[in-house]
Amino acid sequence: MILLHFVYSLWALLLIPLINAEEFTPKVTKTIAQDSFEILSFDDSNTLIRKQDASVTISFDDGETWEKVEGIEDEITWIYIDPFNRHDRAVATSMYESRLYITNDQGKSWERITLPDSEKNISSRGCYIETHPLNKNYFLAKCNYCEKTEVDNEENSGDEEGAPVIFNITHCTDKVFASNDGGKSFSEIKSSLERNENSAISISDCGFAKTGKDSDLESSDTSIICLFQNMQLIMDEFSSPYTESKLVLTTDWGKSLKEFDQFKDKVVNGYRILKSHMVVITQGDRYNDMSSMDVWVSNDLSNFKMAYMPTQLRHSMQGEIYEDAMGRIILPMSRERSDQEEDKGIVSEILISDSQGLKFSPIPWTANEVFGYINLYQPTYLKGTMIASLYPLSRRRNRKGKAKGVKNKGVTKISVDNGLTWTVLKVVDPDNADSFDCDITDFENCSLQNMFYTREGSTPTAGILMTTGIVGDGSVFDWGDQRTFISRDGGLTWKLAFDFPCLYAVGDYGNVIVAIPYNADEDDDPQSEFYYSLDQGKTWTEYQLETTIYPNEVMNTTPDGSGAKFILNGFTLAHMDGTTNFIYAIDFSTAFNDKTCEENDFEDWNLAEGKCVNGVKYKIRRRKQDAQCLVKKVFEDLQLFETACDKCTEADYECAFEFVRDATGKCVPDYNLIVLSDVCDKTKKKTVPVKPLQLVKGDKCKKPMTVKSVDISCEGVPKKGTNDKEIVVTENKFDFKIQFYQYFDTVTDESLLMINSRGEAYISHDGGQTIRRFDSNGETIIEVVFNPYYNSSAYLFGSKGSIFSTHDRGYSFMTAKLPEARQLGMPLDFNAKAQDTFIYYGGKNCESILSPECHAVAYLTNDGGETFTEMLDNAIHCEFAGSLFKYPSNEDMVMCQVKEKSSQTRSLVSSTDFFQDDKNTVFENIIGYLSTGGYIIVAVPHENNELRAYVTIDGTEFAEAKFPYDEDVGKQEAFTILESEKGSIFLHLATNLVPGRDFGNLLKSNSNGTSFVTLEHAVNRNTFGYVDFEKIQGLEGIILTNIVSNSDKVAENKEDKQLKTKITFNEGSDWNFLKPPKRDSEGKKFSCSSKSLDECSLHLHGYTERKDIRDTYSSGSALGMMFGVGNVGPNLLPYKECSTFFTTDGGETWAEVKKTPHQWEYGDHGGILVLVPENSETDSISYSTDFGKTWKDYKFCADKVLVKDITTVPRDSALRFLLFGEAADIGGSSFRTYTIDFRNIFERQCDFDITGKESADYKYSPLSSKSNCLFGHQTEFLRKTDENCFIGNIPLSEFSRNIKNCSCTRQDFECDYNFYKANDGTCKLVKGLSPANAADVCKKEPDLIEYFESSGYRKIPLSTCEGGLKLDAPSSPHACPGKEKEFKEKYSVSAGPFAFIFISILLIIFFAAWFVYDRGIRRNGGFARFGEIRLGDDGLIENNNTDRVVNNIVKSGFYVFSNIGSLLQHTKTNIAHVISKIRGRFGNRTGPSYSSLIHDQFLDEADDLLAGHDEDANDLSSFMDQGSNFEIEEDDVPTLEEEHTSYTDQPTTTDVPDALPEGNEENIDRPDSTAPSNENQ
């Protein structure tokens, strides 16, 4: 019995505390408020403040009671706690101009601070105070001012001072004021940039160099860093603001400013001052705010070094840059998102520097994974711990467009050793294992995934963490499936806390936890509640709230996490006039009967499982989980105990700058980093020893490791002081080949998409520096299609019926399923005016592609592929015709080529409602059709196996294209559309189709594409329809072609093709061979020396031989520049025997730059030119920065590779190039890419006037040294003059000016239809043919009443010449049929008005004559005094001025007639005398008649008038009278059987100028590819 009593007593003694614990209820106090969403707490105090409406309220008892503060008279917009004086100082900003309120005693009293008065018509948008970490009296006030509008001034003219105003944000200015006396007085730190009238925004951003009490930066307490910027937002053609900036240092409160020299010629985008580093970010291109950026790092505010970046930084989140405990810089990067996407500005990549801050690298396991949102969380109280999450930017959609979850796998990982090793977040929770959809013991495929772990607001605990997320393999993440988890070991393992997501907060160092569901209905109870745990999350108790609220925040009232009191702030939308807040103060301080923990209630918890981190072992003393007490050390920070590790290990080291970690984690030399470092600058030897490891800065291990040096090769490494030193190369190696690549044509970044030999897709957003694999979920990519009208869009076709679409250059992909049809490999057809509308072609009834029932179906989508509808059966090619024409007959028109299953013919049909009800057959039988440059051209079969072409410019009216009748044009069996810009179509009509011996005629159309003339004969083509034809980009009218010079022999199969290159400068009217340079690249004369270009000229390999049709001669960006591989001689030699040539004046003069064939690429609008050997291994490239005058070699890799291709962005405006190469490795070959960055070789960016005016770096100049007229005008182009600066994102092609319009010459005209150019240069009618029926124009334009006959010439459409020759002068007008009456009315004159005018003139003449006779002759004696009157005689009657005028007229008339009479008499006498002598000497021989003399005289005068035009019109005898209709001589016109040539005979050359004349520098932009060849055959 005694024993039982003892047991009962012991049981009661043990159970009572547990009963008390279970019965414990926290004290909860509710406060109702309006519009209060943020509560702030002073550190180490019970005082809280919050903004309620426009006032400030305060609580001195941890939120149980609240009152309005005294001393603040204004309405308040914002309050914040001073981060350096969190115990007692807060600031409230006033709604009114230039006023703030500050407290230094935890809100008990407030002092009003007034900043200096603003200028007239300037309004403040608010001010912010920044304080100093060491001196409480040091303030920096930052204010933003904007110009007041006229409405502001009117409305507020009579208001009291300080009244709120409306401001105009179009012109805003930042101002910074400094105070060193606690705000009693302020002085402005004025910007050192002068604001001009174009500046829309002026920014001043200043900050103290000391950012914390533990700052390691070498600076004084009064050091202030300021960044001043002027930005112009509206820039006409420019898409980005122009920015100028200055970064300065002041130590005397702004009285003097010292600019940082390293950034004088750069655009500083922003800066960040950290504990031991200052980071400065500069913008690569001042004219493109999306250009790549450079990161500069300093630890003394004096010397800055450029950090190495593994990728291009384009959108930094400067406010998020921070420094971890090791001194490493954490650099988050955002990206530009598509306008269609909702979430923007999300961190897309995180780079982490080494401890020196100079070499950045991505989180290792995210470097080559799918691109996505990245989040990094580093709890400061858990040294070495990092939690990172990757959320992919690719989502899957089904056919109906409903989201089915994340397509690519996301992942969350943790590291406890500063990122050296990473593991997944393991779920160790056997009790809840069945509640998860995967096996939680399979950690790699079943772990906790958390997408957003915030760095801010974390409360220190002894390894106790909470988060929300889902458990799985990362392939599915549905926000509705999130649950709440808890960890007690610093995040290594987790267990389930709640089946729903919660807001949470911890107190008493993690011993008290409060959690509230986001949604009150989560637990099937509509009322709100919160849960709390007093045993570190082991058990939970529910506390019911009487009101349903939306929780806004839950927080511990002590920021250091030591207290046990909490604030829960929630709101309800029940009231129509706004939100109502319910603020709950929750007090756990009396838990466990108010018991305080004793020593035996604690245990040691070791960070990182007891391993060394930073050379130290860390531990924390924490309460045991089941202890029945609270720590109750309120306002004491969590204590971390350190024990230095005796021996240093590799974990305490990082790779030296010149080394990188390989796949095994070993630090190996990196050639590109060696080039950037200075290790080879200090030695003349071939190798230099370098230690691969360096101790991490700040590591505390005691005994360093012995690190052996590695010999680094310095052969080929550029030395300091050379430009080559500044070139940055990034190498990537692959175990596959890249078979396809294409850039997205935007200035936003340098994104490109690549497909390898395995059908895998890879994406790079930095020009190939970093390359990421696209996860297609196991599907092979079988085709890639880029949208030609929307440069950020592309579509990838998967082998299993998926289509992956991107509209943001490959950052994110949407996945949809194609219709249930067989993929036929046909390209998509896009709507030019609707991004999400396109047509897909699939095979129906195609169990086998050879099945007779298998046929194509056109499917239409209007939502980017989410849904498809069947549009037209048997359609094999469609066009959104209405979106292509300038003036379509119907904007919704669609044209389709249809091939019925039962027929071998194809038809062309159209519809205006996507073939729902409207279907119109345009042609019953066609070969094919294509669209180009606003035309649609249809090839229609004709009798005798011939073709006919029909053209439309509106989709309704079709006209037959009339080809010229010529002796060498047989059947029209094949033609190729070459180009269709500037109102004409260039077409190649094949005249010989024998494989390997193909050639034909080059034709050009009129403006509506219906009438063609021959420009050149025997132009080379290949069997695939490609033609040696290339229009020079960026310049008008310059075309290069290759002709088959022995076409007759080739057609007869007697000889192989012999090609010659010809050039035209007036769009094909005249052709010449290329003038060769005098000497080769070695200064030697060429072997052929004939002065005839027919025998010795330059020839280039053309379009038909290119491996990649995008490798054009020219670039629209590099104006006038062309590269080509060819030779000087009578004909073109084989490719391997040729050299590389270059021109800067559009092909007028050339120079040999390399003795062997090279590949070329243009950069920076021609400011940087790069050559690389073709078909031979190399380790070097050649580059030029002076427009090809001089060339330098640069070694870009350690071993030789065979370069397959060199490329850059389509606009050729970047300073980065991408090389694709293949190198021999042990056991085989490896494919490699090299990104070569030339940004740093230029001293600065050229200074450009955005209005296009000349500046110190840009001048207007003609393309060549000769000021020739081209297309009737002389043009000058804006060109860079300084080779030491780079151009950047400036569209120089937009800046040219016409000096004058020239007189028309022969070069401004071309032959009209049915006319040909004869050997003498004139246009003559083909014998047997008639000119085109001029009256046909009356049928096309019914309103015309007249027409004109052709002169045989027509003016080149591009020509703007004025005056001069008028070879196209119209004939006399003829009446249009049926318009004779209107014609007669236009040109006839009625008799009545004509008679009236004639009689009136006669009367005027008669009256004037009578008046002169009456006043001047009759009154002075009549004609009797004729012989007496002399000039100046007196005696004439002159009573007034009229008499004097009349007498002067009479005297002058008599004088003139008198002299004429004398001259006639004298001439008569002399003639008679001469005739007498002639007759005496020659007897009866007769002389020339009078009319013959007059005619001869006219001819002499005509010769004078035509002086200077002889070479312009080779035979002008027919055109002496330019005012009348020309007659076309037919004496020299050959018959159809005769032979004639289509080009002007080549003049002999006496002096061929050297290429590359001085001053011929130019740069502009081109597309990445030429127009594709389109052939109908």
UniProtKB/Swiss-Prot annotation:
<keyword id="KW-0333">Golgi apparatus</keyword>
<keyword id="KW-0677">Repeat</keyword>
<protein>
    <recommendedName>
        <fullName>Vacuolar protein sorting/targeting protein PEP1</fullName>
    </recommendedName>
</protein>
<keyword id="KW-0325">Glycoprotein</keyword>
<feature type="glycosylation site" description="N-linked (GlcNAc...) asparagine">
    <location>
        <position position="1008"/>
    </location>
</feature>
<feature type="repeat" description="BNR 1">
    <location>
        <begin position="58"/>
        <end position="68"/>
    </location>
</feature>
<keyword id="KW-0812">Transmembrane</keyword>
<keyword id="KW-0653">Protein transport</keyword>
<feature type="repeat" description="BNR 4">
    <location>
        <begin position="414"/>
        <end position="423"/>
    </location>
</feature>
<keyword id="KW-0472">Membrane</keyword>
<feature type="signal peptide">
    <location>
        <begin position="1"/>
        <end position="21"/>
    </location>
</feature>
<keyword id="KW-0675">Receptor</keyword>
<keyword id="KW-0732">Signal</keyword>
<feature type="region of interest" description="Disordered">
    <location>
        <begin position="1531"/>
        <end position="1577"/>
    </location>
</feature>
<dbReference type="GO" id="GO:0006896">
    <property type="term" value="P:Golgi to vacuole transport"/>
</dbReference>
<feature type="repeat" description="BNR 9">
    <location>
        <begin position="1141"/>
        <end position="1150"/>
    </location>
</feature>
<dbReference type="GO" id="GO:0016020">
    <property type="term" value="C:membrane"/>
</dbReference>
<feature type="transmembrane region" description="Helical">
    <location>
        <begin position="1392"/>
        <end position="1412"/>
    </location>
</feature>
<comment type="function">
    <text>Functions as a sorting receptor in the Golgi compartment required for the intracellular sorting and delivery of soluble vacuolar proteins, like carboxypeptidase Y (CPY) and proteinase A. Executes multiple rounds of sorting by cycling between the late Golgi and a prevacuolar endosome-like compartment. Binds the Golgi-modified P2 form of CPY, and this interaction is dependent on the presence of an intact CPY vacuolar protein sorting signal.</text>
</comment>
<feature type="repeat" description="BNR 2">
    <location>
        <begin position="101"/>
        <end position="111"/>
    </location>
</feature>
<feature type="repeat" description="BNR 10">
    <location>
        <begin position="1183"/>
        <end position="1192"/>
    </location>
</feature>
<feature type="repeat" description="BNR 5">
    <location>
        <begin position="485"/>
        <end position="495"/>
    </location>
</feature>
<feature type="glycosylation site" description="N-linked (GlcNAc...) asparagine">
    <location>
        <position position="121"/>
    </location>
</feature>
<feature type="repeat" description="BNR 8">
    <location>
        <begin position="859"/>
        <end position="869"/>
    </location>
</feature>
<dbReference type="Pfam" id="PF15902">
    <property type="entry name" value="Sortilin-Vps10"/>
</dbReference>
<dbReference type="GO" id="GO:0006895">
    <property type="term" value="P:Golgi to endosome transport"/>
</dbReference>
<feature type="glycosylation site" description="N-linked (GlcNAc...) asparagine">
    <location>
        <position position="791"/>
    </location>
</feature>
<comment type="similarity">
    <text>Belongs to the VPS10-related sortilin family.</text>
</comment>
<dbReference type="InterPro" id="IPR050310">
    <property type="entry name" value="VPS10-sortilin"/>
</dbReference>
<dbReference type="InterPro" id="IPR036278">
    <property type="entry name" value="Sialidase_sf"/>
</dbReference>
<feature type="glycosylation site" description="N-linked (GlcNAc...) asparagine">
    <location>
        <position position="168"/>
    </location>
</feature>
<dbReference type="Pfam" id="PF15901">
    <property type="entry name" value="Sortilin_C"/>
</dbReference>
<keyword id="KW-0813">Transport</keyword>
<dbReference type="GO" id="GO:0005794">
    <property type="term" value="C:Golgi apparatus"/>
</dbReference>
<dbReference type="InterPro" id="IPR006581">
    <property type="entry name" value="VPS10"/>
</dbReference>
<dbReference type="InterPro" id="IPR015943">
    <property type="entry name" value="WD40/YVTN_repeat-like_dom_sf"/>
</dbReference>
<keyword id="KW-1133">Transmembrane helix</keyword>
<dbReference type="GO" id="GO:0005829">
    <property type="term" value="C:cytosol"/>
</dbReference>
<feature type="glycosylation site" description="N-linked (GlcNAc...) asparagine">
    <location>
        <position position="1301"/>
    </location>
</feature>
<feature type="topological domain" description="Lumenal">
    <location>
        <begin position="22"/>
        <end position="1391"/>
    </location>
</feature>
<feature type="glycosylation site" description="N-linked (GlcNAc...) asparagine">
    <location>
        <position position="445"/>
    </location>
</feature>
<feature type="repeat" description="BNR 3">
    <location>
        <begin position="179"/>
        <end position="187"/>
    </location>
</feature>
